[in-house]
Amino acid sequence: MSETATWQPSASIPNLLKRAAIMAEIRRFFADRGVLEVETPCMSQATVTDIHLFPFETRFVGPGHSQGINLYLMTSPEYHMKRLLAAGCGPVFQLCRSFRNEEMGRHHNPEFTMLEWYRPHYDMYRLMNEVDDLLQQVLDCQPAESLSYQQAFQGHLEIDPLSADKTQLREAVAKLDLSNIADTEEDRDTLLQLLLTMGVEPHIGKEKPTFIYHFPASQASLAQISTEDHRVAERFEVYYKGIELANGFHELTDAREQQQRFEQDNRKRAARGLPQQPIDQNLLDALAAGLPDCSGVALGVDRLVMLALGAESLADVIAFTVDRA
């Protein structure tokens, strides 16, 4: 294919056929388990407050709205799906487009396909088992292994992430030849994320998927804090062959605590010179009305297909990447 023929798809037709078969297999997986497929909006008047996520923004100027309404493309269907859960829909899954105004590369595209599902009355470990079942079915891989966040850091970096201070974290980063970044970084969680990305991820999930669970409580996001150890959150991620595939939570159901976390995110955004984001009041109202105890997970479908096909990059499994869109 000529590099100038940008009308052509980035992925080959045989790969797109295989992708379609995997999408059908995912739907069968959930149909066999009685999980309802749902569709939720791609746009919302509120968005995520996470300091590491950057949403696309647009403006609706249709009849009756001459002043316009700010809308955000969804970085994940999470908030709308939780509103469905609070309304009593039971276990749900969704295959949808998500959007993040961030990088483009081998493992990233600003528009991507997300698989997200929620299981009422599942704890984190039971959902991890279901994720493992799906990966074995789609990837024909070995059963996954699991490490706590603390075990992963102690094993690969010889540091305890739950007790180390910022000086110790900077010293650990310096051993990875990244002191030029760490020397000016004041946020503890950013240092931990740097260590996870550069010092842990390259060493895990090589032969089989690896779950990392019990992230620090400061990185809980929308997850519950563990009742057994208040230093950690009921949150997990799964990695395979150098790729982060999924991020899951035992979901927070306390509306007041969730609002406090959103507000704290916005304070962090302001301190970094980032725009503060509108908080999703509809989500908070749904939590207040009663979100059932549940666990949920978001999985990158394009990355899953890439692994299933042994492809080198997302461009090999997406019909049109952003540079050809």
Swiss-Prot record:
Its EC number is 6.3.2.-. GO terms for cellular component: cytosol. The keyword GTP-binding does not apply. ATP binds at residues 100-102, 109, 244-245, 300. It catalyses: D-beta-lysine + L-lysyl-[protein] + ATP = N(6)-((3R)-3,6-diaminohexanoyl)-L-lysyl-[protein] + AMP + diphosphate + H(+). Coiled coil: none annotated. GO terms for molecular function: acid-ammonia (or amide) ligase activity; ATP binding; lysine-tRNA ligase activity; tRNA binding. SUPFAM superfamilies: Class II aaRS and biotin synthetases (SSF55681). Gene3D superfamilies: Bira Bifunctional Protein, Domain 2. One of its GO terms (biological process) is lysyl-tRNA aminoacylation. Keywords: ATP-binding, Ligase, Nucleotide-binding. Substrate binds at residues 76-78, 118, 251. The keyword DNA damage does not apply. Homodimer. HAMAP family: EF_P_modif_A. PANTHER family: ELONGATION FACTOR P--(R)-BETA-LYSINE LIGASE, LYSYL-TRNA SYNTHETASE. Belongs to the class-II aminoacyl-tRNA synthetase family. EpmA subfamily. With EpmB is involved in the beta-lysylation step of the post-translational modification of translation elongation factor P (EF-P) on 'Lys-34'. Catalyzes the ATP-dependent activation of (R)-beta-lysine produced by EpmB, forming a lysyl-adenylate, from which the beta-lysyl moiety is then transferred to the epsilon-amino group of EF-P 'Lys-34'. This is Elongation factor P--(R)-beta-lysine ligase. It comes from Salmonella gallinarum (strain 287/91 / NCTC 13346). The lineage of its organism: Bacteria, Pseudomonadati, Pseudomonadota, Gammaproteobacteria, Enterobacterales. The gene is epmA.
